[in-house]
Each structure stands twice: as structure tokens, then as C-alpha cells.
Amino acid sequence: MSNLDQARVASRSAETTRVALIKAATSVFAEYGYDGGSVRLITQRAMANQAAVNYHFGGKDGLYREVLIAATKALEQNSFLCPEELDARSPEEALRLYLRQFLLPLVKRDRVSMYLRIFAWESVRPSEAFNAFIVASPPRIFHLAERVVKRFLPEEAPAETVTFATLWLAHQPMFFVRDAERLARAPFALKFDESSLERLVDTLASFSLRGLGNP
């Protein structure tokens, strides 16, 4: 094998390791959050050594940033909601669509759902890595929440009020997504399927309409 061929094999091997680390990190961070997701567990799932994390990403923060970048891209590509669609609906319909989209991880276990779980973890355990990321690239869940709440608030509403309402709405689905496994156990014993998802959307929409001043 020539030196060039050896370099190509090494390059492919390095890229395979890099992709495996990002995939493993996504599942670990979705399950345990940034703080609870250890590099040791990530490398075990990726079948790589811990030095590979430093080599490819410069450390845990760099790896997490790559996961967040992938999450943002995936949510943009897979979202069935867009700002224009929200604007075309009535305020109540826009609210329901928003809630349903971000509650879907309760009944789906695809990669997009894992990304939403990561964002849900950040709602209670914000990491410095995430804070630095959202300054440059605010997650879609906040953009869409702001779009929805502005449909209910007066045009002259202070920016602070809009921000309060946006954060409040964004956190409605996050709680259920983040704590789904705990809520499925006693004493709550909630069952999450398509039918219960619709009932949850109905309930949260009803509460949210009252909270947004539109009973």
C-alpha cells in the first residue's frame, strides 16, 4: 500500500470515528443532559478512546457544540412548521401546532426527538457550552415560540414582556419531553401515545390561551 493509500485509509478511519462520536454523544446527551453525559460513556458507545474526543473536538465542549450544530440543522430540515405557516393560521391553531411539534418526542424516538430532549435538558440545567451556542444560533423552539406569542400580545407590548411570554411558552412542552420516563412511572403513571398526545396538546393549549390573555 502506497503512502497515499495509507493516508486515505487513515482519513476515512478518522472520519468514521468522528461521526461515531457525534452519534454516541447525541444519544448520551439526550438521556443524561450535558452535565450527566460523561465522555467515558460516549466513547464506550462509539467504541473509541477518550483521546479521540480531544483530537477531533478539543474536548467535551467542542463535541457538544457539534451535536448542537447538527441539532439545529436537523430541526430546520425536518420541521413541519415554518414561521409563514404559523402566520397563516389563527392564533389558536398556531399555538396548537407549536405545542404538538415540540411534544412529538413523547411518541417518537428518532434523531430529531433526541435533539429536542437535549434542548429540554438545557431548560433546567443550562450549560455554559449551550449558552455560548444560543447567543450565535438561538434554537428554533424559541424563534417559533416568539412568533406564536406575538399573535396574542398587543403590538405595543414591551420587549421584556414578549421575552417573558416566549420563554414561558417554550418551556410548556420541554417539561414533559425531559421528564417523560419519570412521568410514566408511579405515582403519575402517564401513558404517552398518539391519543394521549392530542389530549395533552388540548390541555396545554387551553392553559396557554388563558395565560396569554385569550380565554
PLM region spans:
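Amphipathic alpha-helical packing segments from all-alpha helical-bundle domains
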Residues: 76, 93, 127-153, 202, ...
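Helix-turn-helix
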Residues: 20, 28-62, 66, 70
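Hydrophobic alpha-helical connector segments
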Residues: 80-115, 162-169
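An amphipathic alpha-helix adjacent to DNA-recognition modules
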Residues: 15-23, 56-84, 131, 135
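Amphipathic alpha-helical segments used for helix-helix packing
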Residues: 110-132, 180-186
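Hydrophobic alpha-helical segments that form the core
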Residues: 115-121, 158-180, 199-210
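N-terminal intrinsically disordered/low-complexity leader segments
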Residues: 1-16
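Hydrophobic alpha-helical bundle segments that form small-molecule/ligand-binding pockets
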Residues: 138-163, 186, 212-215
